[in-house]
């Protein structure tokens, strides 16, 4: 048990899917897993373990932003020995290369957060995912006929007050979208010798101002959930 997770040791499987929204974690457990069991609920941040096609897998919410995400990731790795962490979330696109409903694999994560500079003695950390997980995601997407978009994301500490004038510059550097956690997830996994990857479904396009309806968001997210579970099974 940790200050933020009240699961017993052994309740988490070595592979864990992460979502910012705990209700989305509950949704995945009920719709996609067999024998799903709630294993933690501190602060209503839910976690489940169950089976997908006979293989054990866990789910955990992590809240919003790098600070919240890295707390849960650290405790999952250090206390519960989780080895592979796959974040599935939504993002806002900033590049003409991607559109609504596209699934992005973040092969790098820049950030306006200071956390990685603090942990890396004020140097620039290359926050990148695990290659093996990335390869599995790519191969699984090919098998499922999913056109996976591959590029960098920008993990921002800001949801509303963001430097919109920087979008063109980010797109020039092959940043496809804005989200809020990948840079912290990757850095924590690197520090603690775990494997991590972030997949994001495009729910809004920050340049064209397009946005999915609530129904379309669910359908789009279901495709990413299937990809995530298939690559981990």
From Swiss-Prot:
Q: How does it assemble?
A: Homohexamer; trimer of homodimers.
The GO terms this record gives for MF are: purine-nucleoside phosphorylase activity
Q: Which residues bind a purine D-ribonucleoside?
A: 4, 179-181, 203-204
Record site: Important for catalytic activity? 217
Species of origin reads Helicobacter pylori (strain G27)
In UniProt terms, what function does this protein have?
Catalyzes the reversible phosphorolytic breakdown of the N-glycosidic bond in the beta-(deoxy)ribonucleoside molecules, with the formation of the corresponding free purine bases and pentose-1-phosphate.
Q: Identify this protein by name.
A: Purine nucleoside phosphorylase DeoD-type
Q: Which SUPFAM superfamilies match?
A: Purine and uridine phosphorylases
EC number(s) reported in the record: 2.4.2.1
Keywords, A to Z, come to: Glycosyltransferase, Transferase
Answer yes or no on keyword Oxidoreductase. no
Origin organism lineage = Bacteria, Pseudomonadati, Campylobacterota, Epsilonproteobacteria, Campylobacterales
Location of the active site: 204
Give the binding site residues for phosphate. Answer: 20, 24, 43, 87-90
Which reaction equations make up its catalytic activity? a purine D-ribonucleoside + phosphate = a purine nucleobase + alpha-D-ribose 1-phosphate; a purine 2'-deoxy-D-ribonucleoside + phosphate = a purine nucleobase + 2-deoxy-alpha-D-ribose 1-phosphate
Matching entries from HAMAP family are given as: Pur_nucleosid_phosp
